[in-house]
Amino acid sequence: MIQQLRHALLILFFSTTIFAQWNNPHHESTSHNTLHGAFSSAPKTLDPARAYSSDETQIIAQIYEPPLQYDYLKRPYQLIPLTLREMPTVTYVTKNGKIIYTIYDLKIKPRIYYQPHPALKTKRELIAQDYVYQIKRLASPTVNSPIFGVMSKYIVGFSDYAKTLQNAYQHKSFINLHDYPLAGATVINKYEYHIKIHGVYPQFLYWLAMPFFSPMPYEADLFYAQPTMKEKNITVDWYPVGTGSYLLEKNNPNEEMVLAKNPHFRGEKHPVSNESIPQVEKLVLSLDKESIPRWNKFLQGYYDRSGISADSFDSAIQLDKNGNPILTKAMQEKGIRLETTVSPSVFYIGFNMLDEVVGGNNKKLRQAISITIDYEEYIQLFLNGRGVAAHGPIPPGIFGYEKNNINKVIYFWNGHNAKRKPIEDAKKLLAEAGYPNGIDPKTGKALVLNYDVTSTGNPDDKAQLNWMRKQFAKLGIELNIRHTEYNRFQEKVRTGNVQIFSWGWLADYPDPENFLFLLYSANGKVKHGGENATNYTDPRADALFNEIKNMPTDEKRLIKIREYLALVQEDAPWIWGVHPIDFTLSHQWVSPTKPHAIANNTLQYQKINPMLRAQLQEKWNKPILWPLWILLGFLILIFIPLIVTYWKRENKTTVKKYWK
C-alpha cells in the first residue's frame, strides 16, 4: 500500500515538472532557429515545370532558382538578376521593318551549386545547359506543363518540338532531351544560353522570374526515370533538386514538410542589414486543417505567423475611429504585429463554358446568377470586410484597374456609389434565358445546378455553402453542392467535368496581361491545359487581348482594356467575386519584413529570435496545477485512513506472533 502511494506521488510530480509545456505540438525544442507554420492541404506537385498553385510555389520558390527575381525592397516591383550576372541582353530581329523575333541572351554566374542529392554524385555546378533542359521539359508530353499553351505561341519551334518528343516517347520510356535540339532555346557556352521568341512579348521577362524557368539537371531527370523510383512514387513531383537557399528535408504531406538550409548555397546578403542569408535554419510546415486549432497554436506561440479566420477576427482586430483596422488590446499585450496588403488576386466562381446549361450562349442565365450572388454581403459576413467586390478580372494595384469603371451588367450608379442591381432584374434575365421563376422546362421542376467545391472540413465552409444555396434560391434555382478532395477537384476542372466551381488567381507578375490571359481561348483548360479554367472563347476578346498584351502602359492601352472588360462583363464567364485584403499577424520574435505580393522566395529574408520565443511560450503555456494539487490532497485524505488501518493490522499481527 505504501509502495502504491509512492508511485502515485511520483507520477504526479513528474507530470507537473517534466511536462511543463505538454501542449507543445512540435517534435523539437522551439529554442532552435526554426520557423514554424502550417498548411491546410497537401500540394499536388513540386515539379517546377508543373506547379502553379500558390501553395506549391511558396515551397518550390525556396528551392529552385529561375534566372531572375524581384527586388525585395523596390516599389513598383522591379526585376533583378538572381542567378544571372546581369539582366538579359535583348536583341530584335526585323524583317521589312517589323520585329519577327526577340532574342534574350542570358549569362549565369559561375560557382552556383545544387543541393546534395543522390542523382548528383559530386558537388554539381549549375550550367546553362540545365536551364535549356528545363525549357525543353515544358514541352514534354510526360510533364504536361500548364504553361505549354502560352509558351507555344512564343518560344520558337516549341509546338513542333512537343510533337517531336511525342513521337520519340512512342519508342522509348525515357529520352535525353539534350539529344533533341530546340530552336528557341540554345546553349552558347557553359554559362550562357539564348531564348528566342516570336515577335515582341515584353512580359516574357516576368516569366523568367517564375519557377517554370528554373534549371533542371539531366542527371535528376534520369534518376527519377528509373522504374524502381516510379514504382515507389519517388519522382521530381515530390523530391525537388535545386540551387536555392533551402532544400526539402522532409516531405510527409500527411504530417509535416520541412525545409532546411542548403549546405551548398552560395550565400547572399540581406539588402538592409547586409547580414548573410538565409538566416532561418529550417521551416517546419505542419498539416493543420482546422482554422480554430491553427489560431490557438498561434496564440500559444507555436506558430510564428498567422492569417486571421472569420471566427477569430473579432478577437484580433478592431476598428479605430477612422474605420482603420488595428489590433485588439489582447493582441497588443502579446507584442503581435499586424500587416495589411491588398492582394493582387481574384477569387471568383466560374461557369464551365463547355457545359450545355450554363456555358455557350446562355449568357442571360449567367448574368442573372451574377447579379444575385451578393458579394458585398459575402465580404462582410465571411471576410469581415477584408476584400473588394470584383467588377472584372484585374485587381487593385495592377494597371487597368479603375475603381470608377463599374460592371454595368451587375451594378448601377446610385449617386457616387456603385450599387448591385435588384433581384427583379435578375429574375427578368432568368425568364429570358428560358427558366421563369427558376423552373427547368425540361423537367417542370426547379433548375438544378452543380457546384463543385473542395472538401476541407473547415466549419467556415459549411456556413458559406449554406449562404451560397440561399443566393441561388432567390432565383428558384436548386444548388447541388458536390464535395471533392482538392487534387480530385483540380482533375475535374482540368477535364471539364464541372458545371460551376470556385477558382482563384494570384498574380504571377504585375501586368494586366497576367489576368486577361485567364480568359484567352488558347489557354483553355480542357483543350490546351492552360489557365483559362472556364474554357471561355470569344474571337473579339482574343483579338483585343492580342492587342493589349504587347502595348506600352499608357492611355491607349487603358482604352483597349476598358473595351475588353465591357465585352467579358457582358459574356459573364465568371461571377466576378472578390479581391482579398490580406491580414498577417507576426509574433514579436519574428523580425519585421516588407510584404511582397509577387515574389515567393522571401523566406530567406526572415529572421527570428528563438530564445525569446521559448521564453514567451513557457510564460504563455504554464500548466494549471491547482486541480492536480486538489487531486493530491484528495488522494492523501483517502490513503491516510487506509495507511493507519494497514499499520495497526500489521503491528497487531506482529505482537501476537511474538507472544506465541
Where are these regions (language model features)?
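Extracytoplasmic/peripheral linker and loop segments enriched in polar/acidic and small residues
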Residues: 22-23, 28, 332-335, 342, ...
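N-terminal lobe/hinge region of extracytoplasmic solute-binding protein
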Residues: 38-97, 241
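Structural transition elements
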Residues: 246, 388-435, 455-463
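Periplasmic-binding protein-like
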Residues: 359-403, 418-427, 568-576
